[in-house]
Amino acid sequence: MAQEITKRDTDAPPSARRLVILAEDDTAFRGLIASVLEREGYEVVEAADGVALLASVETALTIRRERADAFLVVADIRMPGLSGLDVLAILRCASCATPVILITAFGDEATHAEGRELGAAAVFDKPFDVEQLRSAVIETMPPW
């Protein structure tokens, strides 16, 4: 299958990457999402909890300054340590505009509302169609 080349791809600096930082405490589910995104051409950094997610975001922000990487976060809402909502709140308090897509097995309206209030680009309830998440990542990924 031929990969469609977009203007975004051709504008990228030679060393730049399209990076997704994926935080999900279910190892098998995290692996499934990662494989779908990697087939789409994204580099995926996996984190098993919110603390590892926050550390990965800090690293990506530092590298982005040097290499002009484009990246976003996909995070489970309920994880050990810091939740996806906690990490999103920390990023927004630090004036970090990194796009965040949230996923959750506990998708009540209050959870969705809290995610939207904090600036989540999207909130997906588990189980969801991984192709819908893939589409959301494509639409949400910042330009180079």
Locations of regions flagged by a protein language model:
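Alpha4 helix (beta4-alpha4-beta5 surface) of REC/receiver domains from two-component response regulators
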Residues: 86, 107-122, 135
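Short amphipathic alpha-helix used as the core "switch/output" element in two-component signaling
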Residues: 85-96
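The feature encodes the CheY-like receiver
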Residues: 80
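A Lys-centered signature of the CheY-like receiver
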Residues: 126
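Acidic, metal-coordinating helix/loop segments flanking the phosphotransfer/catalytic sites
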Residues: 46-72
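Non-catalytic signal-transmission and effector/linker regions of two-component phosphorelay proteins
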Residues: 1-21, 27, 31-34, 40, ...
